[in-house]
Amino acid sequence: MKIYIVGGAVRDELLGVAVKDRDYVVVGATPEQMIAQNYTPVGKDFPVFLHPVTHEEYALARTERKTAPGYKGFVFHTDAGVTLEEDLIRRDLTVNAMAKDADGRIIDPFGGRRDLEQKIFRHVSSAFAEDPVRILRVARFAARFPQFSVAAETNALMQAMVAAGEVDALVPERTWQELARGLMEVQPSRMFAVLRDCGALQRMLPELDALWGVPQPEKYHPEIDTGVHVMMVVDHAAQQNLALPIRCAALFHDLGKGVTPPEMWPRHHGHEMQSAKLVETVCQRLKIPNDCRDLSVMTAREHGNIGRALELRAATIVTLFERCDAFRKPQRFIDMLQASECDHRGRTGFADVPFPQNAYMQKALAAAQTVNGGEIAALMQQRWPDQPARIPEAIHEARVKAVALAINEVKTPG
C-alpha cells in the first residue's frame, strides 16, 4: 500500500503557491484494508476515506469508463491492482496529473512539470473529451492562472466536444457552480475568453456571447466593443475583491445591448430594461441563486439611473429607493452602487476616474433612512383614521424632503 499526494496540491507547490487542500491517492489497498486502519468510508460513487486523525480525504486509485453523455455518465473501477499511472491518466490536465510520494519525489508521467514551466494547459489524454465539465475547469483555471494559455490541440479537442453536443448535456447547477468559481478568481475575463475560443460560451450563455462585436458610443466607451467592456467591468470587480453577487451583476448588466437592432448602433436606447429581462431568463435557466439573481436584475435595470444620479431630483431618487426596496435591504442597494461603479471604471482610461455617484447615493439613502415611518403613520392615523392611503404618501414626502436637504448640502457645501 502506497500513498501519494496528487493533483492541485503538487501543481501549486511547484508554482510556489500556498497549498490549501491536499488530495491523496492510495495504491495497492482494498476498502477492507483502509477500514482496518481506522479510515472512515465516505465515498458514494467510488471508495473515498477520511484519515482517522487529519480527516483529509484519501481515494483508492481508480479508472473510469464513459457510459452516457454529460458529466455523470461514468462507471468507476477500483481495486488493489490499479496503478498510480492508470489513476493519473484519467485526470484533465497534465499540470494536474502529477503525484508526490512520501519521500518528496515527483512522479510526472505526462509532462506536467514541463507544461507548468511553459505555462500551458494541455489535456492528458483523449479521455478528456468524455467529461464536458472539463471545458469549464480549463476555463476556470485560466481565470486563476491568467498567464497560462490553452494548448492548440486542447482547444481543438474542446471545440470538437462542443460540436458533438457534450456541453448541452451539462446540468444547469453544475454549469453555474463552475462559472461562479471562475468569477471569484483573479481575472475572470480569461475564463470567458477560453469559453469563447472553443465555442462553449455560445452554447452556455448565448446572451453574453452576443455582446462581442456590438459597438457602443466611443465618447462614453473608448473600448467600443460591448463584450470587451463587460470583461473590463468583471475584472475590475475582481481587482476590488468584491463578493460573488456583485461580480455576477457586473457580468450581466449590459446583456440588453446584444439585442439592439444593428441599425440603432452604437446607441442602445432602453437597453437597461432589455438587460433586466434577459438576466431573469439566464438566471432561471442556469438556476442561479436568488442573491445573485436579484442584484443582477436590479443592476441591469438601474445602472443607467445610477450613472445619472447627480442629475436626479430628490423625488426621483426616493422613488428609485422604493423601487429597489432599499429601505428594507440597504446593503443590497449599496452592492448595486458598487456594481455600477465597476461599470463606470470598466472602460478604457476610466479605471481611476472618480465615481461620486456612489457616495452621493449612499448619503441620500442615509438621509431618507432618518425618517421615522412609524411616527408618521401613528400621526396620520390620528388625523385621518379613515384615509390609510395617505400614510405611504406622507412617508414618501418626508423622505423626499430629507433627501433634498442632503443632496443640496453636497451640491452647495458650506
UniProtKB/Swiss-Prot annotation:
Keywords, ordered alphabetically: ATP-binding, Hydrolase, Magnesium, Metal-binding, Multifunctional enzyme, Nickel, Nucleotide-binding, Nucleotidyltransferase, RNA repair, RNA-binding, Transferase, tRNA processing
Catalytic activity line of the entry: a tRNA precursor + 2 CTP + ATP = a tRNA with a 3' CCA end + 3 diphosphate; a tRNA with a 3' CCA end + 2 CTP + ATP = a tRNA with a 3' CCACCA end + 3 diphosphate
Domain of life: Bacteria
Binding partners and assembly: Monomer. Can also form homodimers and oligomers.
Domain text: Comprises two domains: an N-terminal domain containing the nucleotidyltransferase activity and a C-terminal HD domain associated with both phosphodiesterase and phosphatase activities.
Note: A single active site specifically recognizes both ATP and CTP and is responsible for their addition.
Record-stated family: Belongs to the tRNA nucleotidyltransferase/poly(A) polymerase family. Bacterial CCA-adding enzyme type 1 subfamily.
Protein name as it appears in the record: Multifunctional CCA protein
Source organism: Herminiimonas arsenicoxydans
Gene: cca
